[in-house]
Amino acid sequence: MSSTVPSLDATSLETVLRNVAERYPQPLIAGQLKDIPRIAFNIRLIATRMGFDVSVCDLGGGIGLFSVGCAASGMRASLVDDFNDQVNHEFAAVPAAVHRQFAVNVVRTDVVESPPNFPADSLDVVTSFDSIEHWHNSPKALLHRALSWLRPGGLVIIGVPNCVNLRKRLTVPFGIGKWSSMSDWYEQTPFRGHVREPDVDDLKYMARDLQLQNVEIIGRNWLGYYHHSGLVRLVTRIADLPLRAFPTLCADIYLVGTKAAH
């Protein structure tokens, strides 16, 4: 099957992503289509700052739509993941069947324990979305290593769930708001759930440690839109726009910054 997709000059990013999502195995298509607004936002975090003619390395993205969406939209994309989550076991052929079809450079390794060796100053963008909260060891060494792969002025984007978002502040006093289910923590080997969710202050700490410039903290509420509760989804639709002005209260938070010049 050809990997050619319509030019972004002729169609929207969302249409490109829809075309890619429909190439996933049938049981995964609905979830990928549902995730298009978030993936399009993540890609535009890059495109609005760097354009589409860039090299991107995504850490821990699994079989999701982001890295292949970057490639389908004209970026040169690499994906680093151990593909050891349950969904990756069930659909082990996805990286070869979908991602490599769009020339994504798939690097299969534990990103923390055995990080890849990209040449210094060889990448324009390094990203990680909803991944570092799962890592069992400190992300510091890997993030500094990833920073060395970036050219001066290159872009760093880290997206995580906010451990103190508004919903958790309101529900925890009522005994609701555990990070992981008991079955995920107690029954799974190895445990792949959330080890530590950051907050805005944590992202700012990381930005200082990495000596990033042009730092932005951005808030969104994707988790609310995807919540199993219809009430939470309804409240999210009402509160999303005003909450974006207060990232400390948002469900999803992003660190965006650039590598300092040598």
Name the predicted role of every residue range.
Residues 6-37, 41, 61, 82, ...:
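S-adenosyl-L-methionine-dependent methyltransferase catalytic module, highlighting the catalytic core
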Residues 116-126:
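A short acidic, Gly/Pro-enriched loop at the edge of an enzyme's catalytic core
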Residues 43-51:
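Glycine-rich helix-loop-beta junction characteristic of Rossmann-like nucleotide cofactor-binding loops
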Residues 63-75:
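Conserved SAM-binding loop of SAM-dependent methyltransferases across substrates and taxa
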Residues 76-82:
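Conserved SAM-binding motif I beta-strand of class I
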Residues 55, 76, 122-124:
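Structural signature of beta-strand start/N-cap positions in the alpha/beta core
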Residues 53-62:
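Conserved class I S-adenosyl-L-methionine
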